Design a protein with these regions (language model features):
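Active-site cores that bind ATP or allylic diphosphates and position pyrophosphate for catalysis
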Residues: 118-257, 264-268, 317-320
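N-terminal Rossmann-like or analogous alpha/beta NTP/dinucleotide-binding catalytic cores
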Residues: 2-124, 128, 219-220, 224-237, ...
Length: 320
């Protein structure tokens, strides 16, 4: 695998999952990613994270491209535009992921796991900060005979072993962050039982080969970073910097989701201009003093992570 160019230039990325129409939370994160890269004279790559192709029909990928372009959040390569570091759709990258996966296997770090999600929850195992169960190591030391017996009844998923080690990094928005791989994360999935590669491996491989130097994403993924930094190290790849932006909540304090039709861009485009939406989001995230209409370009010169809140952002009543 050849990594993309890292010649001092900042390369950010949009990495949406096309499981539905974009909502305001997706758009806010995309705006911050775009502004952070462009304020440093950088570029943006669009990667479509459709690992689970059945849940991510191509029509949604096409629509999110239209929505981003309509807002003025134009990317420099990727998506249907193409470029030198494709494929840009994760559903087309299984062979690329396999090569890197085999490197981890060769290090003796990958093992089969036969545990079901129901079994893990029933075991009352502790949870990570993003809600996932911290794996208790049930299948970590199975013998070859035990593995062969379990395979007769069930196809395994595959996990990577983690050490009892702290990973510390400086987040561009949230500041210093530390997680213990074993205590706070646990051995984590690399590949599902149906053969689909897991998010943690796919994003590491893709960001490296696309030359991404800066990852901006929602704070719900902050706890994934230690796991990904561990994979960068194991695979000998250059890790990017990270900035995790606060999530956007509705006026009642609930996290927005693609099921919230009122906050989807499909509906918002009928009520507001692109400049009005950008201006309102910029106001909510502290980038301008009033919710006045503006373009993304007009925000570049004044952008600073110091202006962005550290806590989740609750939409003021009546803003949208």
């Amino acid at each position: 695998m050849e990594a993309g160019p890292v010649s001092g230039a900042v390369v950010g990325r949009f990495a949406p999952s096309p499981s539905g129409r974009l909502h305001l939370g997706n758009l806010a994160c995309s705006l911050l990613a775009w502004l952070s890269a462009k304020s440093q004279g950088g570029r943006i790559v669009l990667r479509i994270e459709d690992l689970d192709a059945e849940r991510c029909p191509r029509i949604y990928a096409d629509l999110l491209e239209q929505d981003l372009a309509w807002l003025g959040l134009v990317w420099d390569e990727g998506g249907s535009t193409g470029g030198p570091h494709g494929p840009y759709y994760q559903s087309e990258c299984a062979d690329i992921y396999t090569v890197q996966y085999k490197k981890l296997e060769a290090q003796g770090l990958v093992y089969p796991c036969f545990c079901s999600r129901a079994q893990l929850h029933a075991a009352s195992a502790p949870h990570t900060s993003d809600g996932n169960v911290i794996y208790p190591g049930t299948c970590r030391d199975l013998t070859a005979a035990q593995i062969a017996e379990k395979r007769k009844k069930k196809a395994p998923a595959y996990r990577v072993r983690v050490p009892d080690e702290e990973i510390t990094f400086l987040d561009g928005c949230m500041g210093p962050h530390t997680e213990n791989l074993l205590r706070d994360c646990g051995d984590f999935y690399l590949r599902r039982a149906d053969g689909v590669f897991a998010y943690q491996l796919a994003v590491v491989v893709d960001d490296a080969r696309m030359g991404v130097t800066e990852v901006v994403r929602g704070s719900d993924l902050l706890s994934s970073t230690a796991r990904q930094l561990y994979l960068y190290r194991l695979l000998g790849l250059q890790a990017p910097t990270f900035a995790h932006c606060p999530l956007l909540l509705d006026p009642d304090g609930r996290r927005l989701s693609k099921r919230d039709g009122d906050q989807s861009l499909e509906n918002l485009r009928e009520k507001y201009t692109a400049q009005e939406i950008v201006g309102k989001l910029a106001y909510a995230y502290g980038l301008q003093p009033e919710p006045a209409p503006c373009t993304p370009e007009s925000l570049i010169s004044g952008f600073s992570w110091a202006k962005v809140p550290k806590q989740d952002v609750c939409l003021p009543e009546g803003l949208f």
